[in-house]
């Protein structure tokens, strides 16, 4: 049995995380900290401070043997614990093996077409993903990875051979913007973009459109230049920034207008992108 990894959430049926109905799996932990993260509770592991335990109105949380425990049956899903946590974590994490998680996924068949792993950053657990994907492929389920692209996919060829593709976030193209948004540079993201495209594993390139926090037009141009002649077969998703769930310095940042989104879409199509999704 594989090692147990922290699982933040499992959504049995999703229509926005790849083609068809899919099971979306969110693993806990992230190696960057985006200013616009709308799931900040997936970033870090619990430090057992106990603040959520004291705040829980349903008394569904407790500290046992030095760890926070969660009673799913008692939980009223009010998210008070998420709002209380100052450490960008969640007490509702489950530690599961690939086999245990696959048993849950299999229960959703035949109503799903595949699974999509996300986070946090799911590529922090490549061996777990490899084992999970092998199990899923064995029963005919497709497998997609939703990644921030800061971990080198070239080091995980076996995992990539099992995956149908990677939905890759391109948060910014210029490193100054990238550092401002995430605290790190985008060198590995650009490398992964090129290699995934060449290998036929780039399921989708994703660009968040913000007002004043990145240069999405520059990112779209950078993606087009990198994929080159494959631009016409590269799916591009332009995602409008929304402040829901965001904490910190971008909590009250404005969303781009419809006109701005339409303008970037036109530029993308002028660059040769055919499938451009605006969301």
Predicted regions and their residues:
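Short Cys/His-rich Zn2+-coordinating modules
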Residues: 10-20, 36-38, 65-68
């Amino acid at each position: 049995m594989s090692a147990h990894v922290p699982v933040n959430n499992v959504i049995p049926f999703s229509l926005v995380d790849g083609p068809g109905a899919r099971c979306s799996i969110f693993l806990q932990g992230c190696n960057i900290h985006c200013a616009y993260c709308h799931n900040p509770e997936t970033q870090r592991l619990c430090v057992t401070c106990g603040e959520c335990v004291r705040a829980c109105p349903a008394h569904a949380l407790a500290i046992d043997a030095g760890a926070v425990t969660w009673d799913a049956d008692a939980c009223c899903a009010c998210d008070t614990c998420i709002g209380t946590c100052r450490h960008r974590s969640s007490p509702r994490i489950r530690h599961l093996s690939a086999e245990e998680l696959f048993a849950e996924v299999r229960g959703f068949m035949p109503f799903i077409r595949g699974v999509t792993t996300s986070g946090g950053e799911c590529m922090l657990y490549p061996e777990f993903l490899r084992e999970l994907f092998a199990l899923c492929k064995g029963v005919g389920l497709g497998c997609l990875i939703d990644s921030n692209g800061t971990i080198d996919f070239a080091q995980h060829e076996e995992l990539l051979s099992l995956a149908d593709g990677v939905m890759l976030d391109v948060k910014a193209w210029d490193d100054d913007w990238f550092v401002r948004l995430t605290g790190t540079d985008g060198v590995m993201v650009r490398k992964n973009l090129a290699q995934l495209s060449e290998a036929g594993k780039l399921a989708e390139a994703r660009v968040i459109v913000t007002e004043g926090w990145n240069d999405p037009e520059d990112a779209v141009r950078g993606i087009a230049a990198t994929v080159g002649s494959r631009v016409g077969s590269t799916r591009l998703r332009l995602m409008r920034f929304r402040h829901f769930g965001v904490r910190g310095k971008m909590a009250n940042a404005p969303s781009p207008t419809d006109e701005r989104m339409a303008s970037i879409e036109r530029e993308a199509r002028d660059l040769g992108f055919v499938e451009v999704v605006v969301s």
